[in-house]
Curated annotation (Swiss-Prot):
Residues 59-88, 143-175 are extracellular. This is Casparian strip membrane protein 2. Homodimer and heterodimers. Keywords: Cell membrane, Cell wall biogenesis/degradation, Glycoprotein, Membrane, Transmembrane, Transmembrane helix.
Length: 200
């Protein structure tokens, strides 16, 4: 009687079984990529709005000037932003914020094209925080001077000048409002960058 030899045959796993989990993982990555790309597009749009607000604030403050129609032999009554060091700081700070926001646009575009790249997001998160701090400081300082211009201070005998220089006060008040609009947009940008970085 002959002994039968047992032969073990290895059957490779079918390609459909081996790749069964791959589409699921790919779908998760695509969903995250779509979410991050949507955030990046919204980030770019908000940056354009922040640029407009910061430039508007700087240009309005920088061109604010009013001369009263009456004068004496020795005095001419004039009010301009360069009469107040705080307003000069405001113009410089808002110009710096606007310049940074313009330079940040290419990095925002990179985040749109490559939503999974963490480097541009981290850089924008850090620099947006710095710009937000500078913008808020300039806006708060200018708002204090605008308040004094409107209301004065009886304790220190500072008189309100807005009754005489109405146009000047309207211009500087508008520039302060625009600066705080830029602050709000920068706050949203920082929060969005933080949300995007959480998903990396």
């Amino acid at each position: 009687m002959m002994k039968s030899d047992s032969v073990a045959i290895d059957v490779p796993e079918s390609s459909s079984v081996a790749k069964r989990k791959a589409p699921f993982m790919a779908n998760i990555r695509d969903e995250n990529g779509g979410y991050k790309k949507g955030l990046a597009i919204f980030d770019f749009i908000l940056r354009l709005g922040a640029i407009a607000a910061a430039l508007g604030a700087a240009s309005t403050m920088g061109t604010s000037d009013e001369t009263l129609p009456f004068f004496t032999q020795f005095f001419q009554f004039n009010a301009g932003y360069d009469d107040f060091p705080t307003f000069q700081f405001f113009v410089i700070a808002m110009a710096m914020v606007a310049g940074y926001l313009v330079l940040s646009l290419p990095f925002s575009i990179v985040s749109i094209c490559r939503p999974h790249a963490a480097g541009p997001r981290i850089l924008l998160f850090i620099l947006d925080t710095v710009a937000l701090t500078l913008n808020a400081a300039a806006g708060a300082a200018a708002a204090d001077i605008v308040y004094l211009a409107h209301n004065g201070n009886q304790t220190t005998n500072w008189l309100a000048i807005c009754l005489q220089f109405g146009d000047f006060c309207r211009e500087v008040s508008g520039s302060v409002v625009a600066s705080f609009a830029s602050v709000v947009i920068l706050m949203v940008l920082v929060v969005m960058s933080g949300l995007a970085l959480r998903r990396y």
